[in-house]
Amino acid sequence: MKSTLYLSLLTLPMIGFVQAQGQHHLIDELSSKQTALIQATVNSVIAIDENEFVFNNALQNEDWNDFFYRHAPHLLEFKAVILHWAGHASINPKLLLALMELQSSVLSEPSKSNIMLPFGTLSNKAGFAEQVQDLAITLNQRFYEYAQKVEGKVRSSPTNSATSSLISVLIKTQLKPYGSLNKLVGIYETLSNVPLLLSQNKTPAASLNPSNSFYMSFPWPSGYAWYSGGAHSNTGSGYPYSSLDFNNGSGGWGSNTPWVQAAHGGTVTRYSSCNIRVTHSSGYATQYYHMSNLQYRSGDVINSGAWLGRYANNKNQALCQGGQSSGPHVHFSLLNNGRFTSLHNWYISNYRIDVGNSNYDDNCRNFYFEKNGYKTCAWRALYK
């Protein structure tokens, strides 16, 4: 009886509370013909290494200034845009650059026109930043869309989510994209000196269970309560439900927003003035988006509870490289070696998370934080 009453109380509406949530990136659906063509194509090619597809932990240590000086000095002014969207979508920046070179030769033969449209006809957006955002988000969503479809199934071919994601992008402009995929592999390996293909003696990346050496705390001080909406994917649609939007209920744009703490210790990667990641020695990481006043730079090693910065109270700062947000909050995500990872059954400050059945599911029968037998629903006070 106690649990029934408790759930009833927790699902009562809150009066006067600002329910701030984040971005909803929607991409074009593939037609059935395109889907069939992708499947036929990926069955005939060697798989892309998924660890090279994502913004993996090794890449967090890259000297990106040096990389751009050596390979694309004329794109240095766009480095922040590339790293922001590569970091946000967790797509390897070198892969994005290789795809640009494949489509427009913007690295080897830069011009005013191909700098404006670096991905050419792969994107229907106009402008360098707009195309980078579009391709990074599309590659992200296609990658996890395919991962969801094959989860739990026996793989009968070497193909994987990375291969399917790239083919789904290339197929927009070509009937036989595997030729371009082979060219992309060559360009990438020239840029990075690392193989892009999954070798025959290397097993595909697999989803991992929660690590015993990794523990997360809520990103705010002990004794205080913040609020969360339903779990969702990093982009707000699709899969996996890796992200939560936290705020302390202080109000809308222009309000006095609080400082955000690191949920665990580790090494910092700062992608932009509003986007930062902390990578733990276990390989897991948490990412914090819509931030301001960031206190650390890439390479800094911090402890759990370190003050990362505030979540932004200014919409332009919260969306420092574009995107969407309904109000001030921190967009908090879990990753493992660059792959967004479902928060289902993970513990944070000793609360177990049930992610629900859909993006932003705030029905307490589905989404909740559970601690000591009690459930806290979406938009209810979460005490640390």
Regions found by a protein language model. Give the residues of each.
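Acidic, glycine-rich catalytic/binding loops that coordinate metals and/or anionic ligands
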Residues: 214-216, 254, 303, 325-384
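Short glycine/threonine/proline-enriched tight-turn/helix- or strand-capping micro-motif at secondary-structure
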Residues: 226-262
